[in-house]
């Protein structure tokens, strides 16, 4: 009796395994049928990225099978997330990837590339003298950054000479892009790194725009290793503040100086304004020996 029951159980288990194996084989067979599979990969939207390289990467991701059974090139089951993730990982200048399969079995990869909004450059090995900052900050080690502060590609063809001009009223207009220096190690290729977190970068960019709206356009921000930031003005001189300082208050303090002094007037030779000391700002003019505290 027990033997018969055991044989029945073995038969049932065997039948289930045979059915499962049959289903697996059937699904595998169906997944490889041409009418279910991607035949070719097309890439659109690339500018600086080589489209053939993206095409090869996507084609490699749909090659093979899941668990040696289900085709990865199946139009329903192809690895969307992996393809998009691999493209963004291997090509930092890519901001977004959209995938779609057409009725003629073509996988279309639509790429959106990042747009240069700023430049990141390796910081000088010394603190630039404020009157000579454009010369001291000139460098060939510059990379494009997007509007979120991500460094995504080298500036092609070298860099133009850094010259502060009155036409640079905002970071993204005028003959040059606004430059950020420091924070990212320059000993290795910085592509893929961020200048700082998105919130802090947005605050820094907002300060640049705020200064421009107060008729104090700037061309570069240097973040020093000691935690001090210097915003270099087109008219000459710099605004000095601490990393992590309330940047809204920085703009307010500078605006107060504009109202109470003439240090920003045309013809003045400002060396720096230091707003690191709470409710007082210090400023120094070129060729003067000491700084002056605002009232």
Please report, for each region that a protein language model flagged, where it lies by residue.
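Glycine-rich Rossmann NAD(P)(H)-binding loop
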Residues: 45
């Amino acid at each position: 009796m027990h033997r018969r029951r055991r044989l029945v159980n073995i038969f049932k288990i065997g039948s289930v395994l045979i059915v499962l194996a049959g289903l697996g084989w059937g699904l595998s067979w169906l997944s490889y049928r041409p009418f279910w599979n991607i035949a070719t990969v097309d890439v659109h939207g690339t500018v600086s990225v080589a489209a053939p390289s993206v095409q090869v990467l996507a084609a490699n991701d749909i090659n093979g099978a899941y668990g040696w059974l289900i085709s990865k090139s199946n139009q329903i089951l192809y690895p969307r997330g992996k393809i998009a993730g691999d493209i963004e990982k291997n090509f930092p200048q890519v901001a977004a990837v959209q995938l779609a399969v057409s009725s003629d079995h073509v996988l279309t990869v639509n790429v959106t590339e990042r747009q240069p909004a700023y430049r990141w450059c390796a910081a000088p090995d010394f603190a630039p003298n404020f009157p000579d900052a454009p010369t001291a900050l000139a460098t060939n080690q510059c990379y494009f950054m997007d509007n979120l502060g991500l460094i995504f590609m080298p500036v092609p063809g070298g860099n133009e000479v850094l010259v502060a001009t009155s036409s640079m009223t905002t970071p993204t207009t005028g003959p040059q892009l606004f430059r950020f220096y420091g924070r990212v190690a320059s000993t290795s290729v910085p592509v893929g790194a961020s200048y700082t977190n998105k919130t802090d970068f947005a605050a820094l960019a907002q300060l640049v725009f705020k200064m421009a709206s107060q008729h104090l356009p700037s061309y570069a921000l240097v973040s020093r290793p000691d935690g001090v930031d210097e915003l270099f003005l087109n008219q000459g001189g710099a605004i000095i503040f601490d990393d992590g300082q309330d940047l809204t208050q920085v703009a307010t303090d500078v605006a107060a100086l504009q109202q109470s002094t003439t240090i920003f007037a045309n013809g003045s030779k400002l060396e720096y304004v230091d707003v690191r000391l709470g409710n007082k700002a210090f400023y120094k003019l070129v060729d003067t020996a000491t700084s002056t505290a605002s009232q």
